[in-house]
């Protein structure tokens, strides 16, 4: 499963596939979809239908083999498992369209992440969630993997396979603990380790 980046990939699938002795398939990022839908004057019913349809079609077609979110770098990982209440998405989008604050963008993103996890379970694909380090403008404290504990062990979502990207570094102890106690939670060790001290290997 390959992340080709946003907004445009530097490499296409054919070019990457030609360099690797394995099948290469892209992952579906939800944040570009959310940004695109927010630019349109949609009712909540239209918004959620378009969101579901876009992800579902990508997964059911086999074009994408997983879903990815960088919600950590937008509104943080403190996502309540109760964010999928019937009214939260509607109320959040309405507040955003009327230019109101009150954490409406966070409420919308939390709601949509929970829905993405549900779709991952429906199509039996993994969910990748960025954790830990990111760009200079991120609030690192809100990127702590432990904020996801309540969500990932909630009965509705615990069956989803979840990959914690970047090992949660510098909170890799938290991420390692979660991968140990949550049977369907895993660590990505590809990018975090080059930026970490050699001791990080021993901790993980």
Task: Please place each PLM-identified region on the residue numbering.
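Metal-cofactor-binding active-site regions of metalloenzymes
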Residues: 1-109, 113-118, 181-184, 194-195, ...
């Amino acid at each position: 499963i390959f992340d080709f980046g946003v907004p445009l990939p530097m490499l296409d699938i054919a070019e990457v596939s030609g360099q690797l002795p394995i099948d290469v398939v892209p992952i579906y990022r939800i944040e570009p979809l959310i940004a695109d839908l927010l630019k349109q004057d949609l009712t909540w019913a239209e918004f959620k239908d378009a969101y579901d349809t876009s992800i579902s079609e990508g997964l059911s077609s086999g074009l994408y083999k997983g879903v990815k979110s960088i919600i950590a770098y937008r509104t943080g990982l403190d996502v309540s498992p109760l964010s999928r209440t019937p009214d939260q998405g509607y109320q959040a989008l309405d507040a955003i369209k009327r230019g109101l604050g009150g954490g409406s963008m966070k409420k919308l993103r939390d709601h949509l992440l929970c829905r993405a996890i549900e779709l991952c379970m429906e199509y039996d694909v993994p969910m990748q969630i960025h954790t830990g380090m990111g760009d200079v403008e991120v609030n690192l404290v809100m990127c702590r993997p432990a904020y996801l504990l309540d969500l990932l062990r909630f009965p509705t979502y615990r069956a989803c396979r979840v990959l914690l990207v970047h090992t949660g570094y510098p909170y890799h102890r938290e991420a390692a603990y979660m991968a140990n106690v949550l049977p369907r939670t895993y660590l990505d060790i590809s990018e975090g380790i080059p930026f970490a001290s050699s001791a990080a290997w021993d901790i993980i």
